[in-house]
Amino acid sequence: MIAMKIAECEDKGMTFGEVIDTVETYIEDQHTYFLLESLEALRKNGRLTGLKAMVATALSIKPVMGATPEGTICQLGQARGMKKALVKMADEIAAHEEHAEDKILAISHCNCPARAEELKKLLLARLQPKDVIILDTAGISSLYASDGGVIAVI
């Protein structure tokens, strides 16, 4: 998405300094949200104790997570079951986003395109972004999201 923003700036004929300022503002205004099928990655990296992960998994509790401006991960909400968690995620995104009509929504998924499409549908009922892109996770995102994980950036 950052590369797309740089290309957009170039198409507008911006100077190098203007591109830098515009892209830095764009990055500061981006928000990341995610929902994991498995809590194993959170347990392994110490963000969730083994006992909490076991109980949450047994009860099918899915935490809706987000990134803070400082780059740390925080829990925004939770729900029992993936369908309810997707609704909760869409609600959280809609509650925190201003001027969505000026932004591109990117939804990345790890082997769950139907889940990404469902999140898109839920979000389009709440927001009207400039565009929506759905893509597969890649690299380190795939490792953390694991199968069934969904990441939204707007």
Language-model features: where?
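Mixed-charge interfacial surface used for oligomerization/domain docking
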Residues: M1-I154
